[in-house]
Amino acid sequence: MMDLRNTPAKSLDKFIEDYLLPDTCFRMQINHAIDIICGFLKERCFRGSSYPVCVSKVVKGGSSGKGTTLRGRSDADLVVFLSPLTTFQDQLNRRGEFIQEIRRQLEACQRERAFSVKFEVQAPRWGNPRALSFVLSSLQLGEGVEFDVLPAFDALGQLTGGYKPNPQIYVKLIEECTDLQKEGEFSTCFTELQRDFLKQRPTKLKSLIRLVKHWYQNCKKKLGKLPPQYALELLTVYAWERGSMKTHFNTAQGFRTVLELVINYQQLCIYWTKYYDFKNPIIEKYLRRQLTKPRPVILDPADPTGNLGGGDPKGWRQLAQEAEAWLNYPCFKNWDGSPVSSWILLAESNSADDETDDPRRYQKYGYIGTHEYPHFSHRPSTLQAASTPQAEEDWTCTIL
């Protein structure tokens, strides 16, 4: 693979296409592996349980679910929504027993040779794991596929297009998280909303997210522990929403804008109101508290208890220093050696929520309030043509 830092700015789209986009064969392999595990969860896993267990749905999460998988990253997150889990506390208290049962059944299938595949179950790292991790391999798969299966409480039920959760779901989440002191612990319950947050985004924005993720992973190899990758994905969405909003844009400019946001991490206060807002008094009070926390504040658009920016000032400082160094590399230089410009980010919000409360009082760098995605402009940018379109998938396995 060509070194990203030495890739000319004008060639970043080609770099993404040549090295980061998963090819059709790779996607087919991953989907085949997912079908095997989904079938197992549906038909076999809880068939002999001592009490009824209904799997209401299995949802593909993580990068695979969002459509931002990097080439060569053979992993998949499957969130299994189970009927016995009726509260967030149930999920916390009982997920271990369901993980143990899934593991037991996988190992039984392995002994019985029920599948033409091999499961290599990973030992949990702590006593109450959030996920069962294993590797699935077969002759049909070119390489092993790493799985994380996460039991979850079905807080949302069946979703429809344009779904916005009943505020009482978030009231319940806030109250239980506060009582348990487990803020951000139940983001898996909102996997579908996290996926849908990116689902309708332009293909090229997803390519920019892939580029930022590739940069982040290079930094992580060098620096070690860093803020969560999801925070960088959200920063990329924020940069595009406030600086471009076009389906075709200059990739180097977008990339530089994201790195400048990282450099200015101590000024970041970013959140969205697509799924929750300030209209309910309990949610409003909680959001006010979240938004006055030390910067950076980057709230999960699907889960107001999840602050992706908090808890790792050292990691942000290291990442910012690395970003500053990167701005001097060829990937941010024009053909004449001048630096690529970044997007000018709009600082004002047109959110209807401003009538109820003035969230901009919390703003240092930015605020996002989105209810509906706008109609994207299809006018090509004069700066740079779009890369080859990618096939996108929306994947939910609903168990009837």
Curated annotation (Swiss-Prot):
Its cofactor is Mg(2+). Changing F332A: Loss of activity. It comes from the Eukaryota. Induction: By type I interferon (IFN) and viruses. Keywords: Antiviral defense, ATP-binding, Cytoplasm, Disease variant, Endoplasmic reticulum, Host-virus interaction, Immunity, Innate immunity, Lipoprotein, Magnesium, Metal-binding, Microsome, Mitochondrion, Nucleotide-binding, Nucleotidyltransferase, Nucleus, Prenylation, RNA-binding, Secreted, Transferase. Its EC number is 2.7.7.84. A lipid is attached at C397 (S-geranylgeranyl cysteine). Mg(2+) binds at D75, D77, D148. Its main location: cytoplasm. ATP binds at S63, R210, K213, Q229. Changing C397A: Not prenylated and diffusely distributed. Loss of antiviral activity. Interferon-induced, dsRNA-activated antiviral enzyme which plays a critical role in cellular innate antiviral response. In addition, it may also play a role in other cellular processes such as apoptosis, cell growth, differentiation and gene regulation. Synthesizes higher oligomers of 2'-5'-oligoadenylates (2-5A) from ATP which then bind to the inactive monomeric form of ribonuclease L (RNase L) leading to its dimerization and subsequent activation. It is linked to Immunodeficiency 100 with pulmonary alveolar proteinosis and hypogammaglobulinemia: An autosomal dominant disorder characterized by onset of respiratory insufficiency due to pulmonary alveolar proteinosis in the first months of life. Disease development appears to be influenced or triggered by viral infection. Patients also have hypogammaglobulinemia, leukocytosis, and splenomegaly. This is 2'-5'-oligoadenylate synthase 1. It comes from Homo sapiens.
